Amino acid sequence: MQFKPAVTALVSAVALATLLSGCKKEEAAPAAQAPQVGVVTIQPQAFTLTSELPGRTSAYRVAEVRPQVNGIILKRLFKEGSEVKEGQQLYQIDPAVYEATLANAKANLLATRSLAERYKQLIDEQAVSKQEYDDANAKRLQAEASLKSAQIDLRYTKVLAPISGRIGRSSFTEGALVSNGQTDAMATIQQLDPIYVDVTQSTAELLKLRRDLESGQLQKAGDNAASVQLVLEDGSLFKQEGRLEFSEVAVDETTGSVTLRALFPNPDHTLLPGMFVHARLKAGVNANAILAPQQGVTRDLKGAPTALVVNQENKVELRQLKASRTLGSDWLIEEGLNPGDRLITEGLQYVRPGVEVKVSDATNVKKPAGPDQANAAKADAKAE
């Protein structure tokens, strides 16, 4: 029992030492560091807004070959699917009946002409009346007209190509009877160079474009506004550039769209009528567009686009955005970001609004090559 005060003093000393040691450790613990984020400084850029519209190709000219006289087809003088020239003979219809009609018309003309000349001499001698001479002269004129008609009918037994182009399959073979005025075409010729591309644009897109042009948000694309590029079904770009020809003046009630027609050179006949394509049209120029990298744009629970930016105090701010479309790897921002804003694209998972951060240049975003970097970008997303 004599050692109890000594033990108590020893325990107190150890506890005091432990307490002092803990205080020193707490004082030595470093303060929490601000998280590191990568940012992109928003700069206005100029770009040409393009619209990619679906459409189909159609022949520049189409001619259905039909007979203009009745008869039996003796020969087909073309190869199906080949190129034919205007005026080239395609079919030969049996000319026998028309040759006989022509010979008869020639003989009739000789007879009426001879009678008219003889009456002309006799009328001077008052051997015939003026009425008889007029009747003879009228018969001569009728005979001349009959001769011309017979010559035309005989010429029509040679069925000629009305236009140059590619001819399709023949609907009639040798030995088939054809007639003037029949509804079925003997063959169809289509001119493929140049070729039309008919595309459709919704009235909503058309109205928005007009409002943007009127408000000054977009400027007209200039002299090249009517130029059109074509994307084929396999995703390749057609090497020839076309030109916008016209726009329909009425809206299709069933689809709510307007038809636009473009004309493309087609020397190699790469484009065939009926092909499905996409046409890229230049709509307008935005000289001060705000483009934000997609890495810096997220969605909230409602699906609305948002972004985190670093303010002048190096603190994180939440911005609500209005993004109209994508341009390559960027979003076109209409509201929510301004020139000079520092948009966070790296370290988003480590920060929240109001937190102070350390800022460095982002490494996950390529710097824009220049003010016209987005000129060739495709507008491939609909308005939010």
From Swiss-Prot:
Keywords: Antibiotic resistance, Cell inner membrane, Cell membrane, Coiled coil, Lipoprotein, Membrane, Palmitate, Signal, Transport. A lipid is attached at residue 23 (N-palmitoyl cysteine). Its main location: membrane. GO terms for biological process: response to antibiotic. It is a lipid-anchor. InterPro entries: CusB-like_dom_1 (IPR043602), CusB_D23 (IPR032317), MFP_Efflux (IPR051160), RND_pump_MFP (IPR006143). Residues 362-384 are annotated as: Disordered. The keyword DNA damage does not apply. Pfam families: CusB_dom_1 (PF00529), HlyD_D23 (PF16576). GO terms for molecular function: transmembrane transporter activity. Residues 368-378 have a biased composition (Low complexity). A lipid is attached at residue 23 (S-diacylglycerol cysteine). GO terms for cellular component: plasma membrane. It comes from the Bacteria. It is found in: Cell inner membrane. Residues 115-155 form a coiled coil. Residues 1-22 form the signal peptide. Belongs to the membrane fusion protein (MFP) (TC 8.A.1) family. PANTHER family: ACRA/E-RELATED COMPONENT OF DRUG EFFLUX TRANSPORTER, MULTIDRUG EFFLUX PUMP SUBUNIT ACRA-RELATED. The periplasmic linker protein component of an organic solvent and antibiotic efflux pump; confers resistance to toluene, hexane, p-xylene, ampicillin, penicillin G, erythromycin, novobiocin and tetracycline. This is Multidrug/solvent efflux pump periplasmic linker protein MepA. It comes from Pseudomonas putida (Arthrobacter siderocapsulatus).
